[in-house]
């Protein structure tokens, strides 16, 4: 008898299907940082929070001048869990005080990465979010079985090079899917 080991989706994108009813996740693209038997963790990568890096730096180091470039660096709403906690996905050429290497990317959660970005000494490519999306053991697998999500390998070009409002469709297009043509009604054959 053939054994079937679970397939995990670390370093994949989750693409919300059109019928996604949860407003936290409707029309989202999520980068999966971790996925295993204990659950999953990811960051929504296409939902700006309305804050900029300058707004965050004003809180973290109020006595220092804020570089002008920080006004145009958006902070994204990474998910509904721990929305006051920052996460920085970045190219892997640098490590910081709290960096988890994710293959071609790093994820840092310490303030030093934000200061490095602000000072022009940070990673070449970066994405900053507050909060994350989390799933308990088996929860994401159940949602995938219910056709709530599509998944595809994560593409750093989609994450770093495309405007946020093009990322969801670009990830779907990498699978040959146009989300605008999908029905909001689903079932199982």
From Swiss-Prot:
GO cellular component, one term: cytosol
Matches recorded under InterPro entries: AlgH-like
Pfam family, one: DUF179
Highest taxon, organism lineage: Bacteria
SUPFAM superfamilies: VC0467-like
Family affiliation: Belongs to the UPF0301 (AlgH) family.
HAMAP family linked: UPF0301
Name this polypeptide is given: UPF0301 protein PST_3956
Naturally occurring in which organism (per UniProt): Stutzerimonas stutzeri (strain A1501)
């Amino acid at each position: 008898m053939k054994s079937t080991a679970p397939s995990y989706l670390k370093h994949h994108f989750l693409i919300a299907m059109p019928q996604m009813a949860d407003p936290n996740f409707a029309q989202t693209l999520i980068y999966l940082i971790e996925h295993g038997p204990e659950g999953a963790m990811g960051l929504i990568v296409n939902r700006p929070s309305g804050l900029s890096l300058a707004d965050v730096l004003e809180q973290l180091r109020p006595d220092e001048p804020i570089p002008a470039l920080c006004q145009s660096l958006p902070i994204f709403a990474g998910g509904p869990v721990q929305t006051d906690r920052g996460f920085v996905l970045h190219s892997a050429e640098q490590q910081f005080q709290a960096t988890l290497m994710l293959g071609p990317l790093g994820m840092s959660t310490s303030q030093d990465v934000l200061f490095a970005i602000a000072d022009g000494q940070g990673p070449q490519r970066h994405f900053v979010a507050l909060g994350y999306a989390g799933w308990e053991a088996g929860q994401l697998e159940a949602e995938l079985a219910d056709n709530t999500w599509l998944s595809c390998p994560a593409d750093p070009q989609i994450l770093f090079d495309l405007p946020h409002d093009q990322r969801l469709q670009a990830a779907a297009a990498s699978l040959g899917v146009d989300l605008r043509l999908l029905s909001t009604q689903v079932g199982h054959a």
